[in-house]
C-alpha cells in the first residue's frame, strides 16, 4: 500500500486469506523462522527461541498462527485503508469476470493491471487427489485427517519424502504409534540442510 496509490481487489478461491495455509493440516509449521515470512509492512514473529524445537533455533509459526497473521493483515491493515477489497470464495474466469463459488452468481469488474499469482500456487494433498492409483478397499486420506481418527489402525503407510511426509511420521510417533506399524514410502532420498545456517539476525532485512 505504501508503494502505490492504486485501489486493489484481492480475488481468492478460498474463503479467507492465507493461501494454502487455509487448508493445511493442523500440526503443520513453517519450514524456517517466522521472521522470514509475511508481508513487508507488518512484521511476523520475532527473534525468540523456538519453545519446543531444537535449542538455538528461532521460532516457527504454526498453521493457526499463520492464518491468524494473514487475517490480521487483512482486517487491521488492508481493509481499513479503504483501498483494498477482499473477494473470498470467488473464481476469476478471465476478462474481468468473477463467479462466486457457492452461489454461481457472476459479475464483471474493470481494472488497469492484472496480477496473476496462481502460477505460484503449489499442489497439496488436502485439496488434490492422490497422484497414484488406490486399490479397492484401501483407505487413502490427506494428512489432516489423522487428527480425526476415532480408532487405531493396524498400520500406517506414509507416502512422500518431503516435509509433509516427515511431519506425518513424527506425528504418528508422538501419538504413540509404534515405529514397526509405520511404513514410509519415499520415491527418493531427501536432501536435508541444517537450519542452523539459515537463522536471520535482528539487523538483517
Could you describe each region identified by the protein language model?
Residues 10-19, 110-118:
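Carboxylate/His-rich catalytic cores and anion/metal-binding grooves
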Residues 9-12, 86-87, 116, 181-186:
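A structural signal for short, well-ordered beta-strand segments and their strand-loop junctions
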Residues 13-69, 185-205:
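Glycine-rich active-site loop/strand segments that organize a redox cofactor
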Residues 1-6:
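A short, Lys/Arg-enriched amphipathic alpha-helix followed by its capping loop at the start of a domain
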Residues 50-124:
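Feature captures the FAD/FMN-dependent oxidoreductase FAD-binding
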Residues 56, 62, 69, 118-178, ...:
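Glycine-rich dinucleotide-binding loop and its adjacent helix/turn
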Residues 17, 93, 123-124, 165, ...:
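Flexible, glycine-rich phosphate/dinucleotide-binding loops
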Residues 26, 78, 119, 173-177, ...:
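Hydrophobic/aromatic-lined pockets within catalytic cores
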Amino acid at each position: 500500500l505504501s508503494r502505490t496509490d492504486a485501489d486493489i481487489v484481492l480475488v481468492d478461491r478460498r474463503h479467507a486469506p492465507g493461501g494454502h495455509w487455509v487448508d493445511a493440516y493442523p500440526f503443520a509449521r513453517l519450514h524456517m523462522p517466522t521472521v522470514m515470512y509475511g508481508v513487508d509492512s507488518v512484521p511476523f514473529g520475532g527473534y525468540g527461541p523456538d519453545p519446543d524445537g531444537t535449542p538455538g533455533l528461532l521460532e516457527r509459526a504454526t498453521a493457526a498462527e499463520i492464518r491468524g497473521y494473514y487475517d490480521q493483515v487483512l482486517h487491521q491493515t488492508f481493509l481499513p485503508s479503504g483501498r483494498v477489497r477482499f473477494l473470498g470464495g470467488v473464481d476469476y474466469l478471465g476478462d474481468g469476470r468473477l463467479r462466486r463459488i457457492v452461489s454461481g452468481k457472476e459479475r464483471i469488474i474493470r481494472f488497469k493491471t492484472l496480477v496473476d499469482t496462481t502460477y505460484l500456487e503449489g499442489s497439496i494433498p488436502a485439496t488434490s487427489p492422490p497422484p497414484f492409483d488406490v486399490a479397492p478397499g484401501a483407505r487413502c486420506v490427506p494428512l489432516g485427517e489423522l487428527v480425526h481418527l476415532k480408532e487405531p489402525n493396524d498400520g500406517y503407510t506414509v507416502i512422500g519424502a518431503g516435509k509433509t511426509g516427515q511431519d506425518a511420521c513424527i506425528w504418528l510417533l508422538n501419538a504413540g504409534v509404534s515405529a514397526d506399524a509405520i511404513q514410509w514410502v519415499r520415491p527418493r532420498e531427501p536432501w536435508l540442510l541444517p537450519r542452523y545456517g539459515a537463522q536471520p539476525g535482528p539487523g538483517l532485512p
